[in-house]
Amino acid sequence: MTRGVLLNMAKFYGQEPLPAGKAYTQADIKAAAKKQGVSIQKGDVVLFHSGYMTANLDKTELVPGQPGLGTSGAEYLAQLGVVAAGADSWALEALPSEDHTQAFPVHQILLARHGVYILENMVTQALVDDGVSEFMFVLGVPKLEGAVQAIINPIAIR
């Protein structure tokens, strides 16, 4: 259990859903948080809303590209000491990535270098609809040993 922060990047950029490959930079994250009147603190879980999940609910094929966290944004969140970062998309990070020579660079920055958890396929629309930017984030522990990923059901309490 910790504090959750939702950044509505679709509203920040004025487009929903955001286009594939749109990367959230450190400057974008700072500006979006300021615009929403929230701060990101050590120990927070930060979720991003791009409109990706809602726009793709009725599709039968996985869309190959998506908006998401960029490398400077990932480094910024890690420097702040967040516990986890998540988004309403299947990979959290922008695809195609900013650097086409690296596979999933944001995953490498957050998970491998800084130990920041990644949350994918987060349902953020209800929080956006209610205008929520801050909430209590509750996440149970899956009863799996030795796994590197799991299906979880987090709860946002407003």
What are these regions (language model features)?
Residues 1-158:
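Active-/binding-site microenvironments in catalytic and ligand-binding cores
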